Amino acid sequence: MLVDRYGNTFQSLTNVEKNTGETFIDGKPIYIKTLRFDERGSSLNSWHKLSDLGLSNVNDIWIDESNSFVHIETSSYSGFQSVNTYTASNNYKRATISVADGLNLNSQDGNDINMAWIITIKYTKTTD
């Protein structure tokens, strides 16, 4: 079993909902799920309802930025960026999530690019 420097077991990233074994400040269990979105273009404003992501009864939700990234591929570059990267006002990648609005993937780039968004979300449920 692999553990981090604090003795916590590593969570594998999967698109199947898993209970992390952690609890939120209100004592509710925290769940985790990793999603992938393949997008192409020089700008993006993509909205995804929580129900479309297979989520229901969500109470609190946030993006686990330590396990989320965007893989960028252009004709001259291939690499990874944080999901919230601001290089300039016309070059950024941003992911936000809320119970009311769902997941928003938003980007602007001067190039026509392929983007693979890997977004790991953590959340609690109203039913717990």
In which residue ranges do the predicted regions lie?
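Short linear motifs at secondary-structure transitions and domain/linker junctions
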Residues: 7-10, 70-74, 90-96
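Surface-exposed interaction regions enriched in Ser/Thr/Asp/Glu
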Residues: 81-128
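Short, flexible coil/linker elements and helix-boundary hinge sites characteristic
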Residues: 54, 67-68, 104
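Extracellular receptor-binding modules and their adjoining Ser/Thr/Gly/Asp/Asn-rich linkers
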Residues: 2-58, 114-128
